[in-house]
Curated annotation (Swiss-Prot):
Alphabetized PROSITE patterns for the sequence: G_TR_1 (PS00301), G_TR_2 (PS51722)
Pfam family, one: LepA_C
The protein's name: Elongation factor 4
SUPFAM superfamilies named in the record: EF-G C-terminal domain-like, P-loop containing nucleoside triphosphate hydrolases
Cysteine pairs bridged by disulfides in the record: none
Enzyme class: hydrolase
InterPro entries linked: EF-4, EFG_III/V, EFG_V-like, EFTu-like_2, G_TR_CS, LepA_C_sf, LepA_CTD, LepA_IV
Biological source species: Xanthomonas euvesicatoria pv. vesicatoria (strain 85-10)
UniProt GO cellular component terms: plasma membrane
Length: 596
């Protein structure tokens, strides 16, 4: 165990984590030069296209240090996006140290701070690494000063590297070996292994990534999953080098994969403890807290026959994505589908994209909403993730919305714009800290305002320089109402939204105008109305397409023309009673683009 080093690479989006991981793999000989490609650990095509990391990936490499000893490096490349911060905390639970990568040209950003605090809270040794020093705009001294001022850790011995050109990567490896402590032995010698991640493989069944804290796992041993109480027989164990490599056993302190032919998707929950069935450990390891989804949306198949396929696809995805929640839902407008819970908008986009690509499904998604707490008049509190399920207003005492604490890091010149944006979003300022050339602004904001487009607007008012990190704080009561959309007098449940009373009229008006452009013209007038309860707050009409019935009347009496027009009107009226309006997918997403 003395020569094992477990560490994660943490950083803000785009500061060069995956590129640094590539260089470390190359230097330790994990892959030959011809097998190397950029971001070799981002295996999913969506990750490669967007240039972001979504899943944390682990690699085990041998490294012969300058002191002549061979060390085993187990490292995990983590995502940088705020939606996937739970992936980072899970990865850190399996490590003793972390490399904090900071872009020397951009300086410290919000996620660098948030991830670093997570690492320090878990008692990890943090080694700062300044990346991109080959850029002409890189300023190593400023970046060091910012790390000390903003994060508050000593950056005197920060390693300055360029992951792109491979400069000084050997110094990073030496720093890992000498500064990150080896795994500590536990007080018990019985097997304890923490499940960091699980995914579904079509040939092997469920494969789990584990960190063995104590004891060892061998093929043929019978293991017990402590939370479910089920036992399984281990088929194979091994490590990723990044290729999957089988080993005769995984010992204490190591990070590797195990395959126990678990067929059930929920058989190996993330954060659970594995132990030997014949000689179990006295207690489970402290896992990590379950991530609660914050954003909910309905996903419906375009073709109703795809419903069973959608269920199977979501089941497989959930194994790979511990934060995804879903339950069946039926909607009058859309038929059968699922109400899904996500961590944020990026998470939602990626799940929908994966379902459409990997499982060939055509999906319609409804506008995302957050979870509200509803206090009913009989004193019960319910959590409501679907506006259509809001009880009748006479049964509701108060509605509470989720509030988040947002930390924004920005260069000084954009403060005015950012404060204005936060005020528009009903924010309450908590504090402003000046840290060198950067400013840290703290606000409490309603989550519903942040979820939809706050991130995009923040980037545009600060020319892309501001960065955001947020976490949930509490629920607050407020004057909320549900705005329903009626099309030709029929309520469309998938378009209902909950808004603050002060914004209700404006949102209703904007929604009707937006829908008017998106619903195709019919042979009869289509009335689009926004209503709060029985009170109509706005209306717009999609005019009917009509034939010019007077075209063949040349001159003649006016009563002849009137008769023809009346006859046409009667026909349209009859048609309106039986006609149904098809609502296109764009209309369901109109709610998203209302402020644009």
């Amino acid at each position: 165990m003395r020569n094992i080093r477990n560490f994660s690479i943490i950083a803000h989006v785009d500061h060069g984590k995956s590129t640094l991981a590539d260089r470390i793999i190359q230097l330790c000989g994990g892959l030959q030069a011809r097998e190397m490609e950029a971001q070799v650990l981002d295996s999913n095509p969506i990750e490669r296209e967007r240039g972001i990391t979504i899943k944390a990936q682990s690699v085990s490499l041998p490294y012969t240090a300058k002191d002549g000893q061979t060390y085993h490096l187990n490292f995990i490349d983590t995502p940088g996006h705020v939606d996937f911060s739970y992936e980072v905390s899970r990865s850190l639970a399996a490590c003793e140290g972390a490399l904090l990568v900071v872009d020397a040209a951009q300086g410290v950003e919000a996620q660098s701070v948030a991830n670093c605090y997570t690492a320090v809270e878990q008692g990890l040794e943090v080694v700062p690494v300044l990346n991109k020093i080959d850029l002409p705009t890189a300023d190593v001294d400023r970046a060091k000063a910012e790390i000390e001022a903003v994060i508050g850790i000593d950056a005197e011995d920060a390693v300055a590297v360029s992951a792109k050109t491979g400069l000084n990567i050997d110094l990073v490896l030496e720093a890992i070996v000498h500064r990150i402590p080896p795994p500590k032995p536990r007080e018990t010698d019985k097997l304890q292994a923490l499940i960091i991640d699980s995914w579904f493989d079509n040939y092997l069944g469920v494969v789990s990534l584990v960190r063995v804290m104590q004891g060892e796992i061998k093929p043929g041993s019978k293991i017990l999953v402590m939370s479910t109480g089920r036992t399984h027989l281990v088929d194979k164990v091994g490590v990723f080098t990044p290729k999957r490599k089988e080993l005769p056993a995984l010992g204490a302190g190591e990070v590797g994969w195990i395959n126990a032919s678990i067929k059930d998707v929920h058989g190996a929950p993330v954060g659970d403890t594995l132990t030997l069935a014949g000689d179990p450990a006295p207690h489970a390891l402290p896992g990590f807290q379950e991530m609660q989804p914050r954003v909910f949306a309905g996903l419906f198949p375009v073709d109703a026959e795809d419903y069973p396929d959608l269920r199977e696809a979501l089941d497989k995805l959930r194994l790979n994505d511990a934060a995804l929640r879903f339950e069946p839902e039926s909607s009058e407008a859309m038929g059968f589908g699922f109400r899904c819970g996500f961590l944020g908008m990026l998470h939602m986009e990626i799940v929908q994209e994966r379902l459409e690509r990997e499982y060939n499904l055509d999906l319609i998604s409804t506008a995302p909403t957050v979870v509200y707490e509803v206090l009913k008049t009989d004193g019960t509190v319910i959590n409501m993730d679907n506006p259509a399920k809001l009880p009748q207003l006479n049964l509701v005492q108060e509605i509470r919305e989720p509030i988040i604490r947002a930390n924004v890091l920005t260069p000084e010149e954009y403060i005015g714009n950012i404060i204005k944006l936060c005020e528009e979003k009903r924010g309450t300022q908590i504090g402003i800290n000046y840290l060198g050339s950067q400013v840290q602004i703290s606000y409490e904001l309603p989550m519903a305002e942040v979820v939809l487009d706050f991130f995009d607007k923040l980037k545009s008012v600060s020319r892309g320089y501001a960065s955001l990190d947020y976490h949930f704080v509490r629920f607050d009561a407020g004057p909320f109402v549900r705005v329903d959309v009626l099309i030709n007098g029929d309520k469309v449940d998938a378009l209902s939204l909950i808004v603050h009373r002060s914004h209700a009229d404006r949102r209703g008006r904007e929604l009707c105008e937006k829908m008017k452009d998106l619903i195709p013209r019919q042979m009869f007038d289509v009335a689009i109305q926004a209503a709060i309860g029985s009170q109509i707050i706005s209306r717009s009409t999609v005019k009917a397409m009509r034939k010019n019935v007077l075209a063949k009347c040349y001159g003649g009496d006016v009563s002849r023309k009137k008769k023809l027009l009346e006859k046409q009107k009667e026909g349209k009226k009859r048609m309106k009673q039986v006609g149904r309006v098809e609502i296109p997918q764009e209309a369901f997403l109109a709610v998203l683009q209302m402020d644009k």
